């Protein structure tokens, strides 16, 4: 009888402790949600009339928000933070619907995306913003191929009068580690089927295989063809005309870009700021929200 009561009491205590733990967990979750909602409400931004959404790519746009302190070692001065692609796209969608935001101003000097697919997704989001009837203004001192691909969607593309164009097409750099691993005495046993299964080639080869070269070239060509088609449509030139300019290394400076209708205006940074002030009816750039 004594053993029965002990067993019953132990079961009761165990159940009570479990229920108590569950209740604590529920209260903790409810408290966290309440805190999160309160925090979001307190962080709501009131946008002033005639505001501008400025995009300067100070943080890399990645698939997800992240903070990587090691990036500050490899890239001195970098913040180590990245902005999630979804958050960046949502900001554009909100701006398109907000009557207080007049247009987007985009500085394309340091276009920084984690992947080419993220870059393409963001350009598509800019295109949707443009479809809302609001303008996009793009500026850069110097245009790279990714930077110009993004800028070309803008209603007005501006470039520094003494800027340079580094639009040379696309390429890829592959790393091979066989010699390095051999020196470390590390042997790699790679199991694969088919010559196009090249994910492990970097560990067993010192050079790119013909099959891997073929598939990489196909991928790069497909991406470039897609970019050029979008650029040509935005700038109202033909695909062949743009490819010829790139192939002949015609685009080297701002004058070349202007001559071939790839930029609309040549301005210094302070002139662009004055132009934005005019559009927003403000006296100085510091007053532009």
Residue ranges and their predicted role:
Residues 158-159, 263-269:
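Short acidic-hydrophobic, aromatic-tinged amphipathic segments that line or gate anion-handling sites
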Residues 250-254:
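Internal gly/pro-rich beta-alpha loop/helix module
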Residues 2-238, 243, 247, 277-289:
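Small-residue-centered hinge/linker elements
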Residues 269-271, 275:
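Amphipathic alpha-helical
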């Amino acid at each position: 009888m004594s053993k029965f009561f002990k067993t019953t009491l132990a079961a009761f205590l165990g159940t009570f402790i479990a229920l108590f733990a569950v209740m604590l967990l529920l209260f903790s979750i409810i408290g966290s949600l309440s805190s999160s909602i309160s925090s979001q409400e307190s962080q709501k931004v009131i946008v002033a009339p005639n505001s501008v959404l400025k995009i300067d790519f100070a943080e890399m746009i990645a698939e997800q928000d992240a903070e990587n302190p090691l990036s500050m070692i490899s890239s001195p001065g970098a913040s180590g933070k990245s902005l999630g692609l979804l958050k960046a796209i949502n900001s554009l969608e909100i701006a398109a619907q907000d009557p207080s935001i007049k247009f987007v101003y985009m500085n394309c000097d340091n276009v920084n995306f984690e992947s080419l697919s993220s870059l393409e997704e963001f350009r598509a989001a800019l295109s949707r913003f443009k479809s809302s009837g609001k303008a996009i203004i793009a500026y850069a001192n110097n245009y790279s191929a990714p930077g110009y691909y993004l800028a070309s969607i803008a209603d007005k593309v501006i470039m520094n009068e003494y800027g340079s164009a580094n639009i040379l097409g696309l390429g890829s750099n592959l790393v091979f580690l066989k010699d390095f691993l051999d020196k470390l005495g590390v042997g790699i046993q790679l199991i694969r089927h088919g010559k196009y299964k090249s994910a492990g080639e970097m560990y067993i080869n010192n050079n790119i295989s013909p099959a891997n070269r073929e598939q990489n070239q196909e991928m790069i060509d497909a991406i470039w063809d897609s970019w050029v088609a979008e650029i040509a449509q935005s700038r109202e030139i033909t695909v062949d005309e743009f490819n010829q300019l790139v192939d002949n290394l015609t685009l080297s400076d701002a004058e070349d870009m202007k001559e071939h209708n790839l930029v609309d205006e040549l301005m210094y940074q302070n002139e662009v700021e004055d132009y934005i002030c005019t559009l927003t009816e403000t006296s100085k750039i510091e007053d532009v929200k």
